[in-house]
């Protein structure tokens, strides 16, 4: 022991490069390594070793690997290089006299340490750039996605560049020196300026991109469960609660997406992280991992997990780069002014070594999906967590079917107290064959209500619908993979409910446009209507650029069929407050016929006959869809829309069960929804056209103002017809 301590406190044979020679002086030691410093370095090295091994094992055993997880895995390899470098230097403290191999070992130690330092900082910038790109890339770039081979290629390129820069002293530019705490670069060489230039460039780019990312990921004005990617939903992305049983094909599985991104403006289209399944060949890239395997967490926990990965990776990137900042600044100061301080040198080295110990924090994102939190992000468990943890949480005796006519399509979102064998899935049953006793009676009691009701959609289809390939049928049956492509058919989309409650439909499929399609005489499940695109639905690249500044505000023109009884048919709207944290007003029950479908409040200073640029106010009812037992059945939302152009559509929303909320979809064309309700008197049939433009709201408001009490909106007429139908059925 005394032999070891004497080496530490007396002559440690540390190297110092001679300024007059390119050879290293092996016998001169500028300072000594104290026992406390030696123990501290050993502890930090051991912590970095354990952490890097833990990170590698955890990340390599992930069932679904994302781009971020692969990049962080390479970070762990850099940490191992750092551990190896410091371990080599620690070995050099043992011999009492310098050996012939000391110079080679010290050079190797310095080379590895500088290589991993450069690689770690460059990858930190790369990770931040990737996060910024995926959350802000334009719609036109949606078709391009990172493949596994590309990710590995970028990682190897960073390592190659780092090794090239670190090996320049071996080529005669700069030298490595031995210090009391490690083998590092001689600060008197101009080589230091090159290192600082590379680091400063990476740090500058990281700092610029981190400002908006920090706001989006840590200080976002949106709620924690941010709204889903519109492009992902419009492509038919599967959502939590969708049955994942074998042989069951969902509506166009997601394009290797892991998370819905955050809100962005200026025409950007938030994108999602790419998932690589185990054993996926590099050449197949994003297209190979499209199918969800039953029982995997990808369909249930992917959103909060991937969002947490982005948050943790951002924090780790900033941490690593900042921990290297003191060393880089000190090296430049020493080179420029010749300032030298052993305590500062030691502190900067320890901080750079500490940067190799923080990588395991990324693995915690799997368990701390709601962290890190900051600003206004709520760290407490929220009502949305039930939808993401895959647990069975049943409502107390309440179930309904919610049918949406929106964005040129009809969507039915069931919510029942029936669950299949998959613990992560909610079972959706055919409306004519409900397995829940609670739904059999309403359908039987109200069969007459649906005997002759026809709901049709009249649209003006766009001329440039986007091309989409790899379409799966929206069916719930076992079908071979070779038959997953849609069949092209001509016809009109309609849903008819007849006396035997059979649903018959014909679909339209023109060119690349997707339509709902079913095999002949096949009786679809309710899941057939989940996130299936209709013929004329807008595609992301056709979105109008004239939307409102705030994507989440309101929508109108959506028809909602409430409850299996079908007694009421109402327009629905939804609004999140400006801060995105709560819904106003408070949840309460409102009778549909008392609510205003669309309304207009002109400026009191203006003439009643003039309708300039004012706000359109909508008072409507929407069913709240969540697994919270304490939640009320309905909420009433008030929405305000202000548009400068009378012809521009106001934003629309669609419901996302994955988010348990409505999400924005900005549409650029006008559409109207036609409802035909036959009565016993052929002359009394009601044909209602519900427009959804701001101008239509103003016209309705003008009519309401002019006709006063005599004016009735379409929804009021429809409810009156339902009440009349109900009275006739009771009279019979």
From Swiss-Prot:
Similarity comment: Belongs to the G-protein coupled receptor 1 family.
InterPro entries from the UniProt entry: GPCR_Rhodpsn_7TM
Purpose: Orphan receptor.
GO biological process: antral ovarian follicle growth; negative regulation of ovulation; preantral ovarian follicle growth
CDD domains associated with the record: 7tmA_GPR149
Lineage of origin: Eukaryota, Metazoa, Chordata, Craniata, Vertebrata
Subcellular location field: Cell membrane
Cytoplasmic topological domain residue ranges: 58-69, 134-156, 212-311, 365-732
Name of the protein in question: Probable G-protein coupled receptor 149
GO terms of molecular function: G protein-coupled receptor activity
